[in-house]
């Protein structure tokens, strides 16, 4: 990463969009995205192409802007305060990739026409196909059919929700973008509304849909069998895995390694439980898994400012937020004998603030020999998220960790702070 930034005016200022909603999202997020791309040493041509893609296809998907008082049009807990997306840096050795995710929101979300905000993702994918015509949407079509509630079946379903906050807790769909530099699109589905409609368990619905894929899933069979085995505890009261939601890539050719990820969630935050998640409760005990576990433990302690003598069987101090806990996933790749575990360290819920998170990350980067990143990270964080009036327009939300090919992959996820609406955002 580097701090030799172009001026924001070179890329984003003066851009006029056709309506106040799009203008608000562009003015809020484009400066941050532009600075992230510059910090990550993307070429000027790549920056321009990515910002153009962002303007034409991602910005419209954010939907209606917040109210003048700051209330979001569609509230979802993809971040702790309903901000409908995140931006992130992915670090692997000396390479840094910029990523972005958001909850596509259609203008009729929350009405009888789209009570659970399902139409936004379908509309957005159709638009993106215009820019990426080689993108294979076979998996998208299959899983949207399996996981989204048909219009005629939505009637009366809202009245059956188990808790009042269900609409915010269940993020029915989300899109992610890896800028490599050509955008790689990832789809997330949480089928809880569909499971409610069908009177079945969410994890059973996910397993059924995956197993019914047929021939495309055969090359994942060994890994899938292992994960499904984890639905039964190895000992009384032991850890089990029940997928909460899934994600998959929309690759150019589905048979050419469209990664499939299964996500879990736990409110247990003691290290011994995290170790069980990472090793599938001891089912994975190979040398690479053990090396990755040791590196993860170091990052876990540094990012959360946990003393080395903290009891490994004791949960972290409780956080009252409704969504506080640990998200994790298992990535499936073709013909792989084991899944790749990823842990999302919840620094917003259990950390000690951005200053301590930065300090912990810098110490971790040093321990991995990522010297340039250790020198530049704090400076670049300030460069990306500082505003002209000296305030910060972003904060760390999660830090994810995975380990493959003998190297860690670390991603820092940030919640962007949106701007206050200006005159041109009010119509």
Swiss-Prot record:
Class in the EC hierarchy, top level: transferase
Pfam families for the chain: Trp_DMAT (PF11991)
Pathway listed: Secondary metabolite biosynthesis
Binding site for substrate: 99, 186, 188, 259, 261, 263, 344, 409, 413
Binding site residues for L-tryptophan: 77-78
Signal sequence region: none
GO biological process, one term: alkaloid metabolic process
Keywords: Transferase
Keyword Transferase: yes
Gene Ontology MF terms: transferase activity, transferring alkyl or aryl (other than methyl) groups
EC number: 2.5.1.-
Described function: Indole diterpene prenyltransferase; part of the gene cluster that mediates the biosynthesis of the indole diterpenes penitrems. The geranylgeranyl diphosphate (GGPP) synthase ptmG catalyzes the first step in penitrem biosynthesis via conversion of farnesyl pyrophosphate and isopentyl pyrophosphate into geranylgeranyl pyrophosphate (GGPP). Condensation of indole-3-glycerol phosphate with GGPP by the prenyl transferase ptmC then forms 3-geranylgeranylindole (3-GGI).
Family label: Belongs to the tryptophan dimethylallyltransferase family.
UniProt-recorded name of the protein: Indole diterpene prenyltransferase ptmD
Gene that encodes it: ptmD
């Amino acid at each position: 990463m580097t701090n030799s930034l172009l001026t924001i005016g070179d890329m984003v200022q003066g851009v006029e969009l056709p309506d106040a909603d799009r203008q608000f999202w562009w003015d809020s997020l484009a400066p941050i995205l532009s600075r992230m791309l510059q910090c990550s040493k993307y070429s000027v041509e790549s920056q321009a192409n990515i910002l153009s893609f962002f303007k034409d296809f991602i910005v419209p998907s954010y939907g209606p802007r917040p109210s003048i008082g700051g209330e979001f049009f569609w509230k979802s807990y993809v971040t702790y305060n309903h901000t409908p997306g995140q931006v992130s840096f992915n670090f692997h050795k000396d390479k840094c990739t910029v990523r972005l995710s958001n909850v596509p929101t259609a203008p009729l979300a929350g009405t009888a026409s789209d009570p659970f905000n399902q139409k936004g993702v379908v509309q957005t994918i159709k638009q993106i196909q215009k820019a990426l015509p080689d993108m294979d949407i076979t998996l998208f079509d299959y899983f949207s059919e399996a996981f989204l509630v048909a219009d005629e079946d939505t009637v009366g379903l809202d009245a059956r929700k188990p808790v009042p906050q269900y609409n915010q807790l269940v993020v029915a769909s989300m899109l992610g973008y890896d800028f490599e530099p050509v955008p790689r699109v990832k789809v997330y589905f949480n089928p809880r509304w569909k499971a409610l409609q069908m009177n079945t368990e969410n994890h059973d619905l996910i397993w059924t849909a995956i197993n019914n894929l047929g021939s495309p899933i055969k090359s994942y069979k060994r890994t899938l069998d292992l994960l499904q085995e984890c639905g039964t505890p190895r000992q009384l009261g032991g850890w089990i895995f029940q997928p909460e939601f899934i994600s998959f890539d929309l690759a150019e050719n589905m048979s050419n390694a469209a990664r499939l990820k299964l996500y879990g969630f736990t409110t247990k935050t003691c290290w011994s439980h995290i170790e069980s998640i990472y090793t599938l409760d001891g089912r994975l005990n190979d040398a690479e898994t053990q090396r990755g576990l040791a590196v993860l433990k170091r990052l876990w302690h540094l990012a959360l400012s946990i003393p080395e003598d903290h009891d490994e069987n004791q949960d972290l101090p409780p956080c009252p937020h409704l969504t506080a806990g640990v998200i994790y996933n298992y990535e499936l790749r073709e013909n792989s004998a084991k899944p790749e575990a990823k842990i999302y360290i919840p620094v917003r819920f259990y950390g000690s603030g951005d200053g301590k998170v930065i300090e912990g990350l810098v110490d971790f980067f040093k321990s991995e020999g990522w010297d340039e990143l250790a020198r530049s990270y704090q400076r670049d964080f300030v460069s990306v998220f500082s505003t002209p009036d000296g305030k910060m327009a972003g904060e760390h939300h999660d830090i994810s960790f995975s380990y493959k090919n003998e190297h860690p992959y670390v991603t820092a996820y940030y919640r962007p702070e949106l701007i206050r609406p200006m005159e041109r955002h009010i119509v």
